[in-house]
């Protein structure tokens, strides 16, 4: 087997040759597919538990505020029937929970696969995180991931994002399974939690958050992530 590496900076090509027996390739493929199958089975199991618990989720505040139920019903109908919805409501009415609650109920019913909550302000991110924390008190095992800009979460500022320059990129994919396993033990993947797991597992926190996207139910992100998130969520 030949692999061609092209170094753009110095305009050089490097050809690496490796020889494997058929048995070695068969064993590698079998082991790889087994690991992948185990991860997919785990994902299915997590979602079954999540959907079961969300089906019994009550509105976290007990009673809806004036106008809050109307928003929640509109959000649910929009998800169920498709389309777009724009809502304008006074400050303090509880818009964040009025959006998240019906979206979570629809998630349990299989009407969509994931939620993306984008906001232009830090206060919006905190409102979403606190609302989901209230939901978690009832027991639903929904996993929320708060994305942080690369320049703010990077452990090696000023270094290139590859193994030759950054120790957290070196051997990243060898340590990724352990990092994913540790992260998935946490119900909320805030910036602090992502950084803690990344330091413990010695992996890049920004890349870890990116690789966690298929595993989470709610993504909370800055408005600038809007156009890049959907392809990554698949």
Over which residues does each language-model region extend?
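A substrate-engagement module of RecA-like helicase motors
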Residues: 26, 44-54, 58, 111-219, ...
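Walker A/P-loop NTP-binding motif
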Residues: 76-77, 96-110, 131-135
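Walker A/P-loop
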Residues: 80-102
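Short, conserved "post-DEAD/DEAH" coupling segment immediately C-terminal to helicase motif II
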Residues: 232-234
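Nucleic-acid nuclease catalytic cores
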Residues: 1-15
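Conserved pre-motif I regulatory segment
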Residues: 45-88
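Short, surface-exposed connector motifs at secondary-structure boundaries
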Residues: 81-86, 106-116
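A helicase ATPase "motif cassette" and its flanking acidic/Ser/Thr-rich regulatory loops
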Residues: 14-61
